[in-house]
Amino acid sequence: ILGPVLSLVGNALGGLLKNE
């Protein structure tokens, strides 16, 4: 269950960091 959640969170955080 945590797998997909962590993946989505990681993608969101990665996108924000890459945006800056």
From Swiss-Prot:
Q: Name one GO cellular component term.
A: extracellular region
Work out whether the entry's keyword set contains Calcium.
no
Keyword set includes Secreted: yes
Q: Which UniProt keywords apply?
A: Amphibian defense peptide, Antibiotic, Antimicrobial, Secreted
Cross-referenced Pfam families, in alphabetical order?
Bombinin
Q: Which family does it belong to?
A: Belongs to the bombinin family.
Q: What is this protein called?
A: Maximin-Hu
Which lineage?
A: Eukaryota, Metazoa, Chordata, Craniata, Vertebrata
